[in-house]
Amino acid sequence: LHYPHIDPVIVGFGPVAIRWYGLAYLTGFVVAWWLGNRRARGLHTDWTAQQVSDVIFYGALGAVLGGRVGYVFFYGFKQFLADPVWLLRIWDGGMSFHGGLLGVAVALWLFARSTNRTFLQVSDFVVPLVPPGLGFGRLGNFANTELPGRMTDSPFGMIYPCHADAIRAMNPLCTGQWEDFARHPSPLYQAFAEGIVLFAIVWLFSSKPRATGAVSGVFLISYGLLRVATEFFREPDVQLGFIALNWLTMGQLLSIVMIGFGIVLLVLSRRKAA
């Protein structure tokens, strides 16, 4: 298989351009808004349509700001020190889920305060809406030729073009290993895991009344496990490589921390329910 030629820019108007990456995020937010309204009606909650719109706005802002800042500090701090304006060039790609999670957590805390709800009440409502956006974001990564996988001889392997900007950033000399060997299309694996499998798990679990914090805990555990698994197909970030044990990546380390927090939330929620 060969990577299909995908222009990252859908349409350009002079210096302004509409990109697949941005469209992926926008689609994720729209789907989250639609699911949120459906969830509010289906569970007969006290959430109004306006509150759903407001929390999606808060969450979107937190996701974009936190995702970019998190990527810069978790994965590209040296580049930031050399070129601080790089932090603002979101259109070049480079978003961190874990940074976005922290940004969304802050946003939901602020929203919870404004609506006299607890943070966990808000997060339990919101996290089932998140996975489709994660899946669309991974498709945006694929359109940008970002996050290529490790070399493989499996039938799913894909040959990435050496001329793509994201590939050249990882391999400036454009050596033959890129166009002579197939690699796992890891963004597609992660789109399936995070956008479909995670959505099915969390949505089904949250379809019945649960103790406060349980849905958030299941989300953290499920995402963490799926991310740890799919990272084994993904090439480590070139600026970091493996950070421990010659196999542990930054994404896996942060996901293991997530799993720990998720277990704590799940245990505490069960104790409260008991």
Question: Residues of each region from the PLM?
Answer:
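A feature for loop-to-transmembrane-helix boundaries and adjacent hydrophobic helices
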Residues: 1-274
